[in-house]
A protein has these predicted regions:
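N-terminal helix-turn-helix DNA-binding core of bacterial DNA-binding proteins
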Residues: 2-44
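Glycine-centered, phosphate/nucleic-acid-interacting loop/turn motifs that mediate DNA/RNA or nucleotide
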Residues: 54
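Basic, amphipathic "hinge/linker" alpha-helix immediately C-terminal to the N-terminal HTH DNA-binding motif
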Residues: 63-86
């Protein structure tokens, strides 16, 4: 997938994943990787930025498999931002699909 296209949709995918349940970083990388080829070096800076922008809150939870894990929780403003991105994504999809259909690509 084109890098710029991937970056554009990655925020929405991460926000939707964490809305379903709080996740720690590596768990989120594994979940997002099911639909987009990403690695930790892509996800962690995004998580930091979204946390700084108050879309996520973080908390530590003990782990039976090592040190405590830093979990991400979607805030109310994060939910609003996610819905805004979802609307933009739907609008973009509809526009692109309409354009392609008009030009013989169905």
């Amino acid at each position: 997938m084109n890098v710029q296209l991937k970056k554009g949709i990655l925020e929405l995918i991460v926000l939707v994943a964490v809305r379903e349940k709080d996740m720690y970083g590596y768990e989120l990388v594994a979940e997002v990787s099911k639909v987009v080829d990403v690695n930790e070096g892509t996800i962690y800076p995004l998580l930091k930025r979204l946390t700084n922008e108050k879309y996520f809150e973080t908390y530590l939870r003990e782990s039976t498999e090592g040190p405590p894990r830093n979990y991400y929780h979607l805030t109310a403003s994060g939910i609003l931002y996610m819905e805004e991105l979802r609307g933009e994504w739907t609008e973009l999809q509809d526009g692109v699909n309409s354009f392609l259909k008009e030009h013989g690509y169905e």
